[in-house]
Amino acid sequence: MLRSLVGSEMCIRDSIYTGRKSGTDDGIDVKEQRSTRTGYYMKKRLRMDVNRALGSVTNQQHYIPRIRYTEMYLAYAEAANEAWGPKGDNGNGYSAYDVIKAIRKRAGIGGTSDPYLEQCAGDRDKMANLIRNERRLELCFEGFRFWDIRRWKENLNEPVRGIDWDRDGHSFNEFVVEERNYEDYMYYCPIPNSEILKFSNLVQNRGWKYCLLYTSDA
């Protein structure tokens, strides 16, 4: 995931992204609603071959995938592990183990030896945790994590954490950006009230009794 993040004071190519340089918007809360709250900047979908000079215009293609090959691999691996275990394939030719091994090898992990993967190869629960972590890394910042942690019933009360990099000291300090307080019913989203009014047998999800969300008829 670190390949997708840029932190304050981190070196990217020939530039140092600093949170302490005056006269810029860089750094934690330097300018309201414009600066980073966490000390992180996202780099995943940025092209590194553009002219970064202020005021310059670069004509480069920017592609946003609708569905990715690796996304389908990960979905298959998760389902296969739940249905047939880490190495079962039900005659399809590929097991969860095979798929995750291919994904990790493509990322430069394991190659001829992958001890972590092998530790999970004989245990469904361990393989499930590995697959979840692979989804977290491979699909980060692509809109999957929000839904994944809810369908897995993960703890939603983890605080949002940030880092303050110290370039001179080669260290960083972690801090809490925001506390999160969720109730169990929040694993499910509310049904818009306008939809409930259309069908009397439709019951609002538990905990959202007084939800006043509406949908557009457009």
Report the location of each language-model feature.
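Acidic/polar-rich alpha-helix caps and helix-coil junctions
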Residues: 8-9, 13-216
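Positively charged, low-complexity/disordered segments
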Residues: 1-7, 217-218
